[in-house]
């Protein structure tokens, strides 16, 4: 009888877990739809800026080679790389399966790769998971940003990327790379590595025949464009990462719910079997008692 009570207690416990994971799945699904739309809008804007940079890349190259303006150093790839800043995004919350593993593994591999080349790599961590991971590994973090990956904010995104850009312009770093696990579709996430600085606009066929002209006096306009380019790439990465996180959590909770259902089914079978055995034992005892009284 005590065995039956124990199985019944387990069934109740697993069933409650199933309710919780299913509720979390529904919440993540709702959040994903909202974040997915925001990610699409941000991506379109960032792509348009990329297109503009591609369109004027020929003019940019002319200015870069003929001007010493410090702002144009954002387009200069240094011959010798001594320091690299790595901005990476992880989740602030858990229960999202292997969402953070790809990013943390990639960052760890990049650390080893650059150290092997005697290149100093500085980490700017966004998200509690990544911060705690590297703190545990006793690896120094240049910057730590909590609550930003779970609640992307444009002004905060600007703060993060402006600090990196300023360090590049001041000669404190030679390259800035942005790493995050991004959203691909409802069931898939993909790792994205963006070499943000120095900027290398992709040339397109129409460039040389373009009617656009960018004069050295228009560097201020270029500066505004670059500012927006960096800000939106940073903000888009945060939104994209959050959409991927919700997608991963939705999957993880769906798997957990299905596993809980399967476990409840197993426990119900075990309960019925134990109950049958208990009834059979009681019947045998009754029959044996009657026989002994004859």
Swiss-Prot record:
It is a peripheral membrane protein. It is found in: Cell inner membrane. One of its GO terms (cellular component) is proton-transporting ATP synthase complex. GO terms for biological process: proton motive force-driven plasma membrane ATP synthesis. Keywords: ATP synthesis, Cell inner membrane, Cell membrane, CF(1), Hydrogen ion transport, Ion transport, Membrane, Transport. It holds the Pfam family ATP-synt. GO terms for molecular function: ATP binding; proton-transporting ATP synthase activity, rotational mechanism. Its main location: membrane. Produces ATP from ADP in the presence of a proton gradient across the membrane. The gamma chain is believed to be important in regulating ATPase activity and the flow of protons through the CF(0) complex. F-type ATPases have 2 components, CF(1) - the catalytic core - and CF(0) - the membrane proton channel. CF(1) has five subunits: alpha(3), beta(3), gamma(1), delta(1), epsilon(1). CF(0) has three main subunits: a, b and c. Belongs to the ATPase gamma chain family. This is ATP synthase gamma chain. The gene is atpG.
